[in-house]
Regions:
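Surface-exposed loop and turn segments in beta-propeller and other repeat-based domains
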Residues: 25-34, 73-85, 130-158, 197-230, ...
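Beta-strand-rich domains and repeat architectures in extracellular enzymes and scaffolds
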Residues: 28-57, 235, 245
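Structural signature of eukaryotic scaffold interfaces centered on beta-propeller domains
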Residues: 36-46, 83-102, 153-174, 230-240, ...
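Beta-propeller domains
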Residues: 46-80, 252-256
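Structural motif
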Residues: 57-61, 111-132, 171, 180-195, ...
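Blade-loop segments of beta-propeller domains
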Residues: 67-111
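Loop/turn-rich, solvent-exposed surfaces of beta-rich toroidal or solenoidal domains
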Residues: 215-264
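Conserved blade-ending motifs and adjacent loop-strand segments that build the rim/top face
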Residues: 268-289
């Protein structure tokens, strides 16, 4: 009875009249000066700047106040096997004079990035790249330096991606599919680590299962049988105020654009289906003031949507 009631409440929370309406704020195709406008992936916000990453490790820096590009450059980890799937800023800076904290980028792919010096036979893959953002004399970002790579080799995982709390990154979370996107028996596992203290003297940082502080499954935060990201195409992840958000799908009828959410204590859970008003592939999320920023893909260009964060929280159960 408890599960049935909860499921009915969640369904009500997914009603199109209850969900907050997203706003399209940037279309990359509007800016001919941008060299790459497709295949957007991870995203991280620092101040008023959105660092919008693309497959293979390209970065477009966009001013969220004006909606216009600031700069563009390849990441130091750029390579054909760097999907740059999820991104976030940590709290540490490489040097105290740096304008930006270190940027963390999930590789996602299972093949090594040979462009950074790894051999094609190297076992180091699905890495977390740590990038130092390089700026010019005006403080404009124009490149990056790969200052660390973090590796974790769990025994029974199909994929490995990373996220941290957007406002207080004291913990590092590794998450991914146990079996694979939309496959029978799939689950989304999330494992928590203490956020590694950055040291310039330690380029390769290896995490082990002994370092795991906590493990949970996203579907375990929901009633049994409830639809969750384990049933969808997994994209990025975003943690704020104890709530994990996972945008999923491609925006099609077969693979709907769904935003799943669950509070880590299990007290809130559910999803919003945005396919009818946002028929795009959502990729990643970060917070900007009281807005959630979400870069997405259409067939022809990358776009950026904005969600009202407080209204989203209020609409949750």
């Amino acid at each position: 009875m408890i599960y049935a009631a909860a499921a009915l409440m969640v369904f009500a929370g997914c009603n199109s009249n209850e969900r907050p309406t997203p706003e399209l704020i940037i279309t990359l195709a509007d800016f001919p000066e941008l060299e790459h406008i497709k295949n957007v992936q991870g995203a991280a916000v620092c101040g008023d700047l959105l660092f919008s990453l693309q497959d293979q490790g390209w970065c477009n820096v966009l001013d969220l106040r004006t909606g216009k590009p600031v700069s563009q450059f390849p990441l130091a980890s750029q390579g054909r096997n760097n999907h740059a799937n999820v991104a976030f800023f940590g709290s540490a800076r490489y040097d105290s004079s740096d304008r930006f904290p270190l940027l963390y980028v999930s590789q996602c792919k299972s093949q090594p990035v040979t462009e950074i010096g790894l051999a094609e036979t190297d076992s180091l893959s699905r890495l977390l790249f740590v990038e130092r953002i390089i700026t010019d004399d005006r403080g404009i970002p124009g490149g990056s330096e790969l200052v660390q790579i973090i590796t974790f080799e769990p025994k029974q995982w199909n994929s490995r991606l990373w996220f941290a709390d957007s406002r207080n990154p004291k913990d590092l979370w590794c998450y991914g599919n146990i079996v694979g996107n939309e496959k029978p028996g799939n689950r989304i596992v999330m494992q928590k680590f203490a956020f590694p203290e950055f040291s310039a003297d330690r380029f390769l940082l290896e995490l082990t299962e002994e370092d795991i502080l906590e493990e949970t499954y996203f579907d375990a935060l929901m009633p049994e049988g409830h639809r969750g990201p384990q049933n969808a195409i997994l994209q990025g992840a975003f943690l704020l105020d104890g709530v994990v958000f996972m945008p999923c799908g491609t925006g099609s009828e077969k693979h709907p654009n769904e935003l799943f959410y669950a509070k880590l204590d299990g007290s809130k859970y559910g999803w919003f289906d945005y396919t009818d008003i946002m028929p795009v592939e959502p990729e990643d999320m970060d917070i900007w003031g009281d807005r959630i920023i979400c870069p997405c893909n259409t067939d022809s260009t990358g776009v950026v949507y904005s969600f009202p964060y407080r209204k989203l929280i209020k609409a949750m159960l």
